[in-house]
Amino acid sequence: ELAYHFLLDIDFAQLDSLKLESELKEKDFHIISYGATSLSKMSDEFIYTAYENGVPVRTFPIGPSCKHFTPLDSISPILRMSVMQSEDGAFFYHRGFLPDALREALIYDLQVKRFARGGSTITMQLVKNVFLNRNKNFARKLEEALIVWLIENERLTSKERMYEVYLNIVEWGPLVYGIQEASAYYFKKRPSQLTTEESIFLASIIPKPKHFRSSFAEGGQLKENMEGYYKLIAKRLAQQGVISEIEADSIRPDI
């Protein structure tokens, strides 16, 4: 038995009072059989298709048979932590959902009157890209919630493998998919060679891969307004012990 509880209460005169509750509950729940799509397929090598405006543009395997695939332990620890702290710092500790992050993102979107922040966890992003079509409607959101819940609560794919898949399929620029292509495209390096500044820059692109050029001034250097983002991520890296406090304090948006 599965039950889904959802509550959204908005006072547009006081957006900070917005209430958002979303919870999937189970009682004596067991999976008898899966449908045509295996929800555990990310655990092994599988074929991934990237889409642009609903049209497939790239298809490639996520595993050792792909020359662009990079195992998690071959990716710079600084890059791994930079992306995680930017996208979903609690990824290894939650079960796929962060209601507070969704609430804050919704409040911000309503304040600026546009879709500016998604609030999706890494698991949610994976489910959207690997399992679902590109339709944006309530039925698809329910599908997404159910698949996320099943993968996380039934432990169909390990967190380490999910993060490995994520870093190998995420878009880092127009038709630039995965960390190996991104490292070569921007810095002519392997993923294991990325510096702190380069790693933070790549993390900053993920929310806007098609518009990465907006981060640069006319002279080719990063814009000054990137400094706050660099400082924030560097501080989190230092808190995680990935870099030193001295390096975090001296970080600059300079690549």
What name fits each language-model region?
Residues 1-255:
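Juxtamembrane regions of bacterial inner-membrane/periplasmic proteins
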